[in-house]
C-alpha cells in the first residue's frame, strides 16, 4: 500500500502547488505539535463550511495504517527491502514517522537477527502478529521516515544473534525468472584481398535454480585462393546452486578448481564449495582479533589506514572472527576506546596466501569425468579429483587432495599458516605415479612453497612468491593425457596456412624440475611505484628453460601519467623468443589547456597518448594519438593515431566504439605502407522472458531484468549506455551474486507522462540467475483540475480518487486537484465527509497533447451520484 503524498510530485512541478494546498496548510505546523489539536476551519478559509472534515489531521502528521514497502536498516546496516505492516500509534517513533509503528512478527524478528529466546516477553508473544519491540527489548529504538520509506532499528549488540557482517539469509536469495538467454559477438575484417569473420555465442535457458548453457564459435576465412570455415562447440553444461551445502553443481563441460592442483578441463560432474555464498566477512582468511576491554568500549580495526571494522564490545575478553580485510596484506591496527576516556592500541600482523581459511571454515571440491582439452595432442582419460581445505585454531589451515585415473595417481597434503610479522606461508607435498604415452612408468614427488608478506612501512608488497621443486619422476595429470612423448600444437589461420603458429610444445622426456614465481610491488610514494612479475621454469635433462618476466615503473606528474616497462619471454621448443622495452605517456587535454576538469565537457574527457617500443631484434615502433569519449552518457569512445615502424614504415589507425542500449558497435580503419584494412564488431545480448524479448549490451553471468511498464527511454543509474526500451524493459549486466544489488531509475530522464512510485529496487541473485526488478510506474498526464459543484469549488481538504487507476490526491485552494499518471479521460470521486451528501463525482477529458505537456490545467464539474 502506498498513499501518495507531496513527495510523489516531481520537484520540477511543485510550483503548481504553491498557493494551492500548501499556502493554506502553512499555518498548520504550529497546531500539529500538540496531540489531539482542534482545527478551526475558519482559520483556513473565511467560509469554514467550505472546508472538508479535518478530524484526520487533529492528531498531527498521521498517515493511514497499512502495509508499506520500506528499506529496513539495523544498527546502520542495510538488511533489505520488505513489506511491513504498520499500525497507528501515539508512541515516539520519530518526527517523520507519520504516527506509525511497525508490527513485528517472528519472521521479521529473525530477519533482523534478534535473539528472541533471551527475552521472555517475546517468547510469550511468539504467536502475536504485531509484537511491540520497544516494550519487549530494553534500549531498542525505532525511527521511521515515512517520506523516505526507511525504517531504522537500533538494537543492543547483546540482543542479537551471532552472525557475520554482511550476512544475507538464503530466504532472500532470488533464483530468478524463467528465461532464454543469448550472448553474441560478431567481428569481421576486410583488407588486402582477404575476408575473415568470427562469431561466438553463449546461449542458455534458466528454469528455477537450473541453468543450461552452451558456448560455441564459428570461423570463416577467404583469400589468396583459399577458403576455410569451421564451427567449434566449446562447451555445454548444466549448473545449479545447492544452497544447504553452500555449493554449486556443474554437469557437463567445465574446469576443475585450482586451489590445490592445477586446473584442468573436464566433461563430467563437479560439486564444489561456493565462496560467493558466504558473507564477505567469512571469505578467504583473516586473523582472529582478541583483546580485553576494561569497560563498555568501541572497537575499531584499521588496515592500511582504512577502517574495516567497528563495533561495540562489553567489558571483558572479546573475540572477533568475521573480519573482511580490504586486501590480502597489511597489518591490522586495533583501537579500543574505553568509556572512561582511556585507549588501547596494538597491531596484529597480517598476510595471506590463497589457501588460508578462517578457523572453522571447510571447503571441498569434487570432480569426476573425462579429461577435456582444446589441445589435439591430448586424449580424454576418465579421472576423479577431490580436494579439501579446513581452517584450524592458531591460524593454521590444513589441506589435501587426490587425483585418480587409469594411468595416474596423485596425493597431496599441505599446511599453511599466518606467521604474523613474518607474513603468511604454505607448504605442501605431492606424490604421483604415472604411465606416459610410451608406456613407461614413473614415480616422483613435488614440493611447493608459497609466501606472501606486506611491509607497509617500506611500501613493499610480496603479493605472492612461490617455489616448486619436483623430482625427475614427477608428472601431472595434464602430462599423462598426451598421446605422444613429444609434439607441437599449431594454430592455422587461412592467410598463412603454410606457416602455422606454434601455440604449444611438449616433451615428456624433459619433466619439470623447479619453478620460481614472483609478484612484488614497491611504492615510491609521490614518485610512483615499481613492480616485478614473472616465472622461471627449469626441466630435467635439458639446460633450456621457460622464462617470463615483466618489470615496470609507473608514475604521474601534474595529471600526466607515464610508465616504462620491460618484458622477457622465452619458451622451450618455441622460436622467436623476444625482449621488449616500452614507454607509454597519457596527457589529459585539460592539462594542456590549463582548464579545470569538468566531466560534462568532451574536451576535458579527451587525452593525448604516445607509446614507443623496441624489441631484441632492433625493431622500433612509435605511435602518437588522441582519444576520449563523446555523447551525454560518455558511451562513445574514439581513438586516432599515427606512427612509424621499422618493418612497415608509416602506420595509423582510427577506431570508435559505441555502447548502445541494445548492444555494442565498434569499427576501425588501419593502414601502413603495404596494406589497408577495415574491421568491425557487433556484440550484444538477447533475453526472452514471459513479457517478451529484451535486447541488451553483452550479458554477464548474472543479470537483472528491469521492468518499468510504459517507461521507455529511462536511463539506469551507474550503467553506461543502458536505458529502457519502448516498453519500459532493460537489462542491468554483471549483477553481484548473493549480494544486494541496487537498481535505480534516473528520474531526470523520465518523460512528462511517466511517474514511478519508487525509483530504487534491490535484489539478491543466485549464480547465473536473471532476476526481475519491478518498478510501479504510472503512465499518464500530470494535471491540475479545478473541481466545482454547483458553481462553487468543492471543499478544501477533500479526498480525491480517480476511479479507473486508483490515483488519490487532495483538494487545495479554490477546488484545485493535482494528479499524476492520470488517464486522458476519467472519473474523480471527491469526498469531504462520511455522509452520502458529502461526496460527488466529476468526469473530465484531457486533450491528447497533454501527454507532451509538463502540467495540463482544466476544469471539471462535480455532481452527486445518481443526479
From Swiss-Prot:
Intrachain disulfide bonds: 840-862
Primary residence: membrane
InterPro entries the UniProt entry points to: Fimb_usher (IPR000015), Fimbrial_membr_usher_CS (IPR018030), FimD_plug_dom (IPR042186), PapC-like_C (IPR025949), PapC-like_C_sf (IPR043142), PapC_N (IPR025885), PapC_N_sf (IPR037224)
One example GO MF annotation: fimbrial usher porin activity
Induction: Expression is negatively regulated by H-NS and subjected to cAMP receptor protein (CRP)-mediated catabolite repression.
Leader peptide range in chain numbering: 1-35
Traits of the deletion mutant: Deletion of the operon under classical laboratory conditions does not result in any major effect on E.coli capacity to form biofilms compared with the wild-type strain.
Keywords, comma-separated and alphabetical: Cell outer membrane, Disulfide bond, Fimbrium biogenesis, Membrane, Signal, Transmembrane, Transmembrane beta strand, Transport
Gene Ontology cellular component terms for the protein in this record: cell outer membrane
Bilayer topology: Multi-pass membrane protein
One Pfam family recorded for the sequence: Usher
GO terms (BP aspect): pilus assembly
Subcellular location, record wording: Cell outer membrane
Stated family: Belongs to the fimbrial export usher family.
Additional remarks: The operon is cryptic under classical laboratory conditions, but is functional when constitutively expressed.
Described function: Part of the sfmACDHF fimbrial operon. Could contribute to adhesion to various surfaces in specific environmental niches. Increases adhesion to eukaryotic T24 bladder epithelial cells in the absence of fim genes. Probably involved in the export and assembly of fimbrial subunits across the outer membrane.
Protein name per Swiss-Prot or TrEMBL: Outer membrane usher protein SfmD
Encoding gene per record: sfmD
Amino acid at each position: 500500500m502506498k498513499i501518495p503524498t507531496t513527495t510523489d510530485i516531481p520537484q520540477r512541478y511543485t510550483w503548481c502547488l504553491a498557493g494551492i494546498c500548501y499556502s493554506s496548510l502553512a499555518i498548520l505546523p504550529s497546531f500539529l505539535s500538540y496531540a489531539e489539536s482542534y482545527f478551526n476551519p475558519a482559520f483556513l478559509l473565511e467560509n469554514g463550511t467550505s472546508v472538508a472534515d479535518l478530524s484526520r489531521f487533529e492528531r498531527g502528521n498521521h498517515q493511514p495504517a497499512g502495509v508499506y514497502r520500506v528499506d529496513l536498516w539495523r544498527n546502520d546496516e542495510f538488511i533489505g527491502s520488505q513489506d511491513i505492516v504498520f499500525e497507528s500509534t501515539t508512541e515516539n517513533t520519530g518526527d517523520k514517522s507519520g504516527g506509525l509503528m511497525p508490527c513485528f512478527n517472528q519472521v521479521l524478528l529473525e530477519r533482523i537477527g534478534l535473539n528472541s529466546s533471551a527475552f521472555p516477553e517475546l517468547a510469550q508473544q511468539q504467536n502475536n502478529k504485531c509484537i511491540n519491540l520497544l516494550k519487549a527489548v530494553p534500549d531498542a529504538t525505532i525511527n521511521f521516515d515515512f517520506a523516505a520509506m526507511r525504517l531504522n532499528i537500533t538494537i543492543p549488540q547483546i540482543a542479537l544473534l551471532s552472525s557475520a557482517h554482511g550476512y544475507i539469509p538464503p530466504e532472500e536469495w532470488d533464483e530468478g525468472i524463467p528465461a532464454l538467454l543469448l550472448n553474441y559477438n560478431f567481428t569481421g575484417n576486410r583488407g588486402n584481398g582477404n575476408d575473415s569473420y568470427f562469431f561466438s555465442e553463449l546461449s542458455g535457458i534458466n528454469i528455477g535454480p537450473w541453468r543450461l548453457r552452451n558456448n560455441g564459435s564459428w570461423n570463416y576465412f577467404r583469400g589468396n585462393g583459399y577458403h576455410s570455415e569451421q564451427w567449434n562447440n566449446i562447451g555445454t553444461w548444466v549448473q545449479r546452486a545447492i544452497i544447504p551445502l553452500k555449493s554449486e553443481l556443474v554437469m557437463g563441460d567445465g574446469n576443475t578448481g585450482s586451489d590445490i592442483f592445477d586446473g584442468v578441463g573436464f566433461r563430467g560432474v563437479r560439486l564444489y564449495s561456493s565462496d560467493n555464498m558466504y558473507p564477505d566477512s567469512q571469505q578467504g582468511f583473516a586473523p582472529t582479533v582478541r583483546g580485553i576491554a576494561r569497560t563498555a568500549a568501541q572497537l575499531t580495526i584499521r588496515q592500511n589506514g582504512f577502517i574495516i571494522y567497528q563495533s561495540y564490545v562489553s567489558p571483558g575478553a572479546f573475540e572477533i572472527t568475521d573480519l573482511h580485510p580490504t586486501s590480502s596484506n597489511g597489518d591490522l591496527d586495533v583501537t579500543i576506546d574505553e568509556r572512561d576516556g582511556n585507549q588501547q592500541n596494538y597491531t596484529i600482523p597480517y598476510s595471506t596466501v590463497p589457501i588460508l581459511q578462517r578457523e572453522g571454515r571447510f571447503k571441498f571440491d569434487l570432480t569426476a569425468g573425462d579429461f577435456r582439452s582444446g589441445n589435439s595432442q591430448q586424449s580424454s582419460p576418465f579421472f576423479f579429483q577431490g580436494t579439501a581445505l579446513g581452517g584450524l585454531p592458531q591460524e593454521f589451515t590444513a589441506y589435501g587432495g587426490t587425483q585418480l585415473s587409469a594411468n595416474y595417481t596423485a596425493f597431496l597434503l599441505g599446511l599453511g599458516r599466518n606467521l604474523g610479522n613474518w607474513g603468511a606461508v604454505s607448504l605442501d607435498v605431492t606424490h604421483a605415479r604415472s604411465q606416459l604415452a610410451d608406456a613407461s612408468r614413473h614415480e616422483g614427488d613435488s614440493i611447493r612453497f608459497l609466501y606472501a608478506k606486506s611491509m607497509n612501512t617500506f611500501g613493499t608488497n610480496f603479493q605472492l612468491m612461490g617455489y616448486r621443486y619436483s623430482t625427475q619422476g614427477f608428472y601431472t595429470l595434464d602430462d599423462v593425457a598426451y598421446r605422444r612423448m613429444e609434439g607441437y600444437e599449431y594454430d592455422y589461420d587461412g592467410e598463412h596456412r603454410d606457416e602455422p603458429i606454434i601455440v604449444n610444445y611438449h616433451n615428456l622426456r624433459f619433466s619439470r624440475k623447479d619453478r620460481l614465481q614472483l609478484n612484488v610491488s614497491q611504492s615510491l610514494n609521490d614518485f610512483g611505484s615499481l613492480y616485478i612479475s614473472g616465472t622461471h621454469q627449469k626441466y630435467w635433462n635439458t639446460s633450456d628453460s621457460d622464462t617470463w618476466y615483466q618489470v615496470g615503473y609507473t608514475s604521474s606528474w601534474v595529471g600526466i601519467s607515464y610508465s616504462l616497462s620491460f618484458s622477457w619471454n622465452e619458451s622451450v621448443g618455441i622460436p622467436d623468443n623476444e625482449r621488449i622495452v616500452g614507454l607509454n605517456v597519457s596527457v589529459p587535454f585539460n592539462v594542456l589547456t590549463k582548464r579545470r576538469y569538468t566531466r560534462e565537457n568532451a574536451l576535458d574527457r579527451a587525452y593525448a597518448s604516445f607509446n614507443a617500443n623496441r624489441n631484441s631484434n632492433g625493431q622500433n615502433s612509435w605511435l602518437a594519438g588522441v582519444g576520449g569519449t563523446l555523447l551525454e552518457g560518455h558511451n562513445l569512445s574514439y581513438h586516432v593515431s599515427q606512427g612509424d615502424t621499422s618493418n612497415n614504415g608509416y602506420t595509423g589507425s582510427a577506431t570508435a566504439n559505441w555502447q548502445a542500449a541494445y548492444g555494442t558497435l565498434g569499427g576501425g580503419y588501419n593502414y601502413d605502407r603495404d596494406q589497408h584494412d577495415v574491421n568491425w564488431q557487433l556484440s550484444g545480448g538477447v533475453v526472452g522472458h514471459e513479457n517478451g524479448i529484451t535486447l541488451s549490451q553483452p550479458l554477464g553471468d548474472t543479470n537483472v531484468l528491469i521492468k518499468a511498464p510504459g517507461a521507455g527511454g529511462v536511463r539506469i543509474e551507474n550503467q553506461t549506455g543502458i536505458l529502457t526500451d519502448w516498453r519500459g524493459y532493460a537489462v542491468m549486466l554483471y549483477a553481484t551474486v548473493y549480494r544486494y544489488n541496487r537498481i535505480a531509475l534516473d528520474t531526470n530522464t523520465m518523460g512528462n507522462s511517466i511517474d514511478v512510485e519508487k525509483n530504487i529496487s534491490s535484489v539478491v541473485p543466485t549464480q547465473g540467475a536473471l532476476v526481475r526488478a519491478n518498478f510501479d510506474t504510472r503512465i499518464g498526464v500530470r494535471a491540475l483540475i479545478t473541481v466545482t459543484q454547483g458553481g462553487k469549488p468543492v471543499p478544501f481538504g477533500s479526498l480525491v480518487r480517480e476511479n479507473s487507476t486508483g490515483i488519490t490526491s487532495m483538494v487545495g485552494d479554490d477546488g484545485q486537484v493535482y494528479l499524476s499518471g492520470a488517464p486522458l479521460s476519467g472519473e474523480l470521486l471527491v469526498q469531504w465527509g462520511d455522509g452520502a451528501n458529502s461526496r460527488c463525482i466529476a468526469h473530465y477529458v484531457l486533450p491528447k497533447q497533454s501527454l507532451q505537456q509538463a502540467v495540463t490545467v482544466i476544469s471539471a464539474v462535480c455532481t452527486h451520484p445518481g443526479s
